[in-house]
């Protein structure tokens, strides 16, 4: 469960390392985001010379979440960290590589580019 002020790890090579959620998409009453949901983030730590800079505001999609999520078959999926992939205005990843596994829920949400770049889909 990702909400405002949640600190997140960036799982791509866009140049950002740590970000903080500042908005969850889905209406004014929506509080939490989970796997495959879009959020707006502020970059808190970045690599020098990277594509994104510190203090930059951008869109991101949640690819790993600590809070377990139930699947249709009754199983649960959860990860060790909250991670996002930064997106551009067209909804495509800003980086060219994805680090770590991503959830299968991204395929259902039509993030095919992220799924194809990921080393493992759980």
UniProtKB/Swiss-Prot annotation:
PROSITE patterns: RIBOSOMAL_L14
GO molecular function, one term: structural constituent of ribosome
Gene Ontology CC: one annotated term: cytosolic large ribosomal subunit
SUPFAM superfamilies: Ribosomal protein L14
Pfam families (alphabetical): Ribosomal_L14
One annotated GO biological process: translation
Keyword Acetylation on entry: no
Alphabetical UniProt keywords: Ribonucleoprotein, Ribosomal protein, RNA-binding, rRNA-binding
Subunit structure: Part of the 50S ribosomal subunit. Forms a cluster with proteins L3 and L19. In the 70S ribosome, L14 and L19 interact and together make contacts with the 16S rRNA in bridges B5 and B8.
UniProt family annotation: Belongs to the universal ribosomal protein uL14 family.
Its job: Binds to 23S rRNA. Forms part of two intersubunit bridges in the 70S ribosome.
Protein name listed in UniProt: Large ribosomal subunit protein uL14
Taxonomy of the source species: Bacteria, Pseudomonadati, Chlorobiota, Chlorobiia, Chlorobiales
